[in-house]
Amino acid sequence: MSYGLALMEITDKATINNDPHPDLFDELVSVLHKMDTQENRLNILFWYYEMKLLTLLGFKPDLSMEGASEAKFMDPGGSPNSRNILEALQTHSLDTIPNLSITTKDRKIVGAFLTGYMRYYFDYSGPLHSFEFMKKLNS
């Protein structure tokens, strides 16, 4: 449930009131349905939605990092699988995301990369309230 709340929170931060985004809404509903049935893939589904949100709103991450001055501080290749994970999220549909091997380091790198993009383009700082709630539950 916390991941679902986080999806709602980032959608709210990234969109303007009364500015319809039917494609984004469809992706949100689809990801929420998948999260309900694939609890073992919550991270990958969350990242997929972040990537889709960025792409649909015109901020598709440049994974090549060549000339990406706005994101030089974010290295998508900082772990063994992170670039492959990000490329899979960009190139696959929700129904075709492969089962990926995700290490702890991958989780940190991919999460930081996507969060960095979200914060850069949507100008929000601080942790998501839903993630802070999850941390408290898990501690």
Task: Name these PLM-found stretches.
Residues 1-139:
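Non-catalytic alpha-helical scaffolds and adjoining flexible linkers that form interface surfaces
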